Amino acid sequence: MARSKISVIGAGAVGATVAQTLAIRQTGDIYIFDIVDGLAEGKALDILEGAPHWGYDLDIKGFCTADESKYAEMKGSDVIVVTAGLARKPGMSRDDLLLKNIGIMKSVGEAIKKYSPESKIVVVTNPADIMAYAIYKASGISPERIIGLGGSLDSTRFRTFLAQELNVSFEDVNAFVIGGHGDDMVPFIRYSNVSGIPIEDLLPREKIDEIVKRTRFGGGEIVNLYKTGSAFYAPGISIAVMVESIVNDRKRVIPCAAYITGEHSKTYLVNNLFIGVPIKIGKNGVEKIYDLKFNEDELEAWKKSVESVKKNSAIADDYFAKNQ
């Protein structure tokens, strides 16, 4: 049986961690792309040289997309992971960064449309819901084949902090976060449990609120500790889990940024936009969107997240209208 093929666009710390994790788990052949000369090729060779120890007999190759024709090498990819993008620099506003990364997504989306339009796409570049929308606009790919990282990473942070506080196994904690990052995230505390025991029966509300706050700023905590960069291990692993669920048709239920339309719009208060919600991920991409019932506090938090997504999606719409 032919091996799966996964392309990773962006050879920075997150992209390289995704590639290495997928290689170790022998998920499929891995093709890495980056605009910086030698970076993708170097990361690919570095990962490949670990094969004798870990025993992954895979094709692992890197390509420089300064020559855009090199994108042709992603043809036939089962999954394309998009991590390419700029980091915010001093003096750069959030809107400036958003526009620059939307421009990058436009270029990447057009390349996907040209060379590998049948692939499933996992979008990582922040903010993932808006970048997924930009990839959709640029590529014209069916939206159920596009998934943004969304709440997958926030959820694993939430689960980690709960497990640490309770001194229990990480895998016994079930909890998830929907919506956007930071202030826009919506942790579903009512659905959080340890092997079925509700979190609210195990921790006082004050402690839960502390953990929620830490989760909201989990990325910033890492940035403050690193001082020279942002998180890449946990994001890389979160992405690899999503890719494996597609490639191996595992039907994992994970909160991710998905395209909301039709009946789901009534629940989630958006239409024809991407936002973080619980989805089932399988060989076809987004195979099911789960509608949630909000209580009053959750609904208020959700509306805030929705407004942020609508605002930023409008910026993307305006960009594409001006850059046809």
Curated annotation (Swiss-Prot):
Entry keyword annotation includes ATP-binding: no
Signal peptide (residue range): none
The EC number(s) this enzyme carries: 1.1.1.37
Record: active site: H181
GO terms for MF: L-lactate dehydrogenase activity; L-malate dehydrogenase (NAD+) activity
EC class (word): oxidoreductase
CDD domains: LDH-like_MDH (cd01339)
Superkingdom to which the source organism belongs: Archaea
GO terms classed as biological process: lactate metabolic process; tricarboxylic acid cycle
Binding site for NAD(+): G10, A11, G12, A13, V14, G15, D34, N101, V124, T125, N126
Swiss-Prot/TrEMBL keywords: NAD, Oxidoreductase, Tricarboxylic acid cycle
Residues at which substrate binds: R88, R94, N126, R157
Catalysis performed (reactions): (S)-malate + NAD(+) = oxaloacetate + NADH + H(+)
InterPro entries noted in UniProt: L-lactate/malate_DH (IPR001557), Lactate/malate_DH_C (IPR022383), Lactate/malate_DH_N (IPR001236), Lactate_DH/Glyco_Ohase_4_C (IPR015955), Malate_DH_type3 (IPR011275), NAD(P)-bd_dom_sf (IPR036291)
PANTHER family: L-2-HYDROXYCARBOXYLATE DEHYDROGENASE (NAD(P)(+)) (PTHR43128), L-LACTATE DEHYDROGENASE (PTHR43128:SF16)
Function: Catalyzes the reversible oxidation of malate to oxaloacetate.
Similarity comment: Belongs to the LDH/MDH superfamily.
Listed name of the protein: Malate dehydrogenase
Organism, as annotated: Picrophilus torridus (strain ATCC 700027 / DSM 9790 / JCM 10055 / NBRC 100828 / KAW 2/3)
Lineage, top ranks: Archaea, Methanobacteriati, Thermoplasmatota, Thermoplasmata, Thermoplasmatales
Name of the coding gene: mdh
